[in-house]
């Protein structure tokens, strides 16, 4: 079974998704992360069916069984985590200014690689502490 990486980002008021392999030209949007994950998988399957029907070459990773691996941008991570934790809590955990986190969430500014990792680690650390309560 092959793994297909799918990028998910936040655009204005929706999540948007597209496969990293641009030979499968599909996009999907959704108000929630779960909705966009489901929509992009359906869109890819529909597109692959069309490619097969028209005799087009199917990219290698889509031949046979495959499953998606979703890769969220920092903007998408921040928007999704807003449902569960406050930016103030994340700011305290990461030591990144709350306003700066807002700039990253809106796309006004793009964080560097080290900062992206710091944000992801901060979300994970808060999640672990919350899970420990139960």
Describe the role of every protein-language-model region:
Residues 93-94, 122, 126:
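Generic non-transmembrane alpha-helical segments
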Residues 36, 116-120:
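Hydrophobic micro-packing sites on short alpha-helices
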Residues 15-19, 119, 130-132:
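Generic low-polarity alpha-helical segments
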Residues 1-3, 42-99, 103-105, 109-116, ...:
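Short, charged, surface-exposed hinge/linker loops at domain edges
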Residues 1-56, 60:
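DNA-contacting interfaces and partner/effector-binding or oligomerization modules
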Residues 124-134:
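Short C-terminal boundary/hinge segments that cap the last helix of small helical domains
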């Amino acid at each position: 079974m092959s793994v297909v990486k799918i990028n998910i980002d936040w655009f204005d008021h929706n999540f948007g998704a597209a496969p990293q392999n641009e030979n499968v030209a599909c996009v999907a949007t959704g108000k929630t992360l779960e909705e966009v994950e489901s929509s992009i998988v359906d869109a890819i399957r529909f597109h692959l069916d069309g490619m097969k029907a028209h005799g087009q070459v199917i990219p290698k990773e889509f031949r046979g069984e495959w499953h998606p691996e979703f890769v969220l941008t920092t903007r998408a991570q921040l928007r999704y985590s807003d449902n569960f934790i406050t930016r103030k809590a994340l700011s305290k955990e990461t030591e990144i200014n709350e306003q700066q986190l807002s700039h990253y969430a809106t796309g006004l500014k793009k964080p560097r690689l080290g900062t992206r990792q710091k944000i992801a680690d901060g979300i994970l650390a808060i999640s672990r502490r919350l899970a420990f309560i139960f």
